[in-house]
Amino acid sequence: MLQDATLTTLASLDTNTVSDALDFMGLPGATFGLRPLWNCPKIVGRASTIQLGPKTGTAPTVHLISPVIASVTTDDRILVITGGTEGISCWGDILANAAKMKGIRGSVIDGMSRDIEGSESIDYPVYGRGLTMISARNRLIQVASGTPIVVAGVTVCEDDYVIADRCGTVFVPAAKIAEVLALAQRIASRQDGMVQAVRAGQSVEDVMHDKKFEAIKG
């Protein structure tokens, strides 16, 4: 798998640190509720956005998400899917196998997955709101891809950066990635120092004082 310098740096961080950097910059991006649906590894990559919606007609349609998987030509993609319906799956093991074959790094679903053992068995990471067994067929369709979407309250654009780990999922606007990473690295370094200070016996009240966090900006 090829890894450019930006993704390498992002992979060296965690969602907590990236979320903190976005907070300092006054930017949205951190989400709540999009967690690993099996004990999968952290993923970092670029967003391929997919909008789903209810199926209203009776005519057969191309299966949701499959056209996006077929179009992938690089190995930095994470599928970012929104428009799911409570209790209805918008991901399953056949899609996971197809995505794995295309070198896609994982899926983040503002919705539910089924067949999670199938994704786990091929080490395909899936992050989302929960699990179900109910099929999307004749219930959900793909209505758009490659367009801005809203995921857990955050607007995500095609090619934005994604990091997801056990604490959840964070999106970073592509135009801000360099600034966010630079600040996140400073935060990580400062927080490592704060942990060491506590372990060395310094007062946690002093170590965690707001003024210490404000100093990270400088």
Could you tell me what each predicted segment is?
Residues G168-V170:
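Channel- or pocket-lining gating/hinge segments that regulate access to a cavity or pore
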Residues V162:
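C-terminal binding/interaction regions
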Residues M1-E158, V172-Q202, H209-G218:
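Feature captures the catalytic cores and cofactor-binding loops of soluble hydro-lyases/lyases
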